[in-house]
Design a protein with these regions (language model features):
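Conserved N-terminal entry element of GNAT/NAT acetyltransferase domains
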Residues: 1-13, 17, 21
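Active-site rim helix/loop that mediates acceptor-substrate recognition in acyltransferases
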Residues: 19, 32-56, 60-61
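Conserved beta-strand in the GNAT
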Residues: 58, 64-74
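A short, internal acetyl-CoA/4′-phosphopantetheine-binding micro-motif in the GNAT/acyltransferase core
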Residues: 89-100, 127-128
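Conserved acetyl-CoA-binding loop-helix of GNAT-fold acetyltransferases
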Residues: 94, 100-117, 138-139
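Short glycine/proline-centered loop/turn elements that form peptide/ligand docking sites
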Residues: 104, 108, 128-133
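Conserved GNAT acetyl-CoA-binding A-motif
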Residues: 115-128
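Conserved acetyl-CoA-binding loop of GNAT-fold acetyltransferases
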Residues: 138-146
């Protein structure tokens, strides 16, 4: 059974790990070196988590944090999924042992529901064109924007 809890400031260290997982590259590349988390264009998605407007949830399976979906509003033009300065940019990651087990969709739907409740009319994300999670994003209402 999956439960959800709020991603809060006490989750800062584990959020870095989830951000690292979210930086997906097609096989055979595997995970990027952790040093990528020092890149300013990557750090913006997790650094100082808990700012006003940050929104995130953690998927908990049998008492274990399985992954998270988080969103942050950034200034226009900042971030790979930037649309404007009011639309949150979304990140999602599941620990490898919880991937491909049907957890991503309920996690994302719960996070999107909370975003709508917070007054966000839209949410953006960026994804590698070969990422196998694209059908999940489409089922959750995302579409391709050029």
């Amino acid at each position: 059974m999956i439960e959800f809890r709020t991603l809060d400031t006490s989750d800062q260290s584990v959020l870095w790990g989830w951000l690292h997982i979210a930086l997906w590259d097609p096989p055979p590349a595997g995970l990027r070196p952790r040093e990528v988390l020092h890149d300013p264009g990557v750090r913006i998605y997790a650094e100082g988590w808990g700012r006003p407007g940050d929104l995130g949830i953690v998927a908990v399976v049998n008492g274990v944090d399985a992954g998270a979906c988080w969103m942050r509003v950034l200034p226009e033009g900042v971030g790979l999924a930037s649309i404007d300065d009011t639309t949150p940019q979304l990140g999602i990651a599941l620990e490898p042992c919880y991937q491909h087990r049907g957890l991503g969709e309920p996690l994302m739907r719960e996070a999107l529901g909370r975003a709508w409740q917070a007054g966000h009319e839209k949410v953006s994300l960026t994804v590698h064109p070969e990422n196998p999670a694209i059908p999940l994003y489409e089922r959750c209402g995302f579409g391709k924007v050029e």
